[in-house]
């Protein structure tokens, strides 16, 4: 795969796990949700990868702004979309999916929001397979699972009747 389209800008970190320093090289288009909804976060990414600012935007920050025509014109080989997205096209956008597929664009759905403990490793493994980055995906998933087990192990050692701590994660 030489040409990638992200159906949500906020999927950029997942792509970066696999692409690393080569992040913008294959990315031909993405939604503009990342920079509009998290300008400081996007600014950090664009400082590290200035080429991101040159990547075509195929919409703003909601699925209704996604332009099928712009996306198809970029000639991506694969469109990576978020399951139940909200910021980009999702599995419920049948017409958009049909147009992308009719143009010969493979469509892949990943999920880091609806069931992250179950779907994060699955999504990274799928991306690794699709993008030819299996080794990078396996390395991440191995580390991710080990860190998750470390947290779960500590929670199992809490004395009976002790409430588990509440945790909020933000990237």
Q: Which residues does each PLM region occupy?
A:
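N-terminal ligand-binding lobe of clamshell/alpha-beta domains
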Residues: 1-171
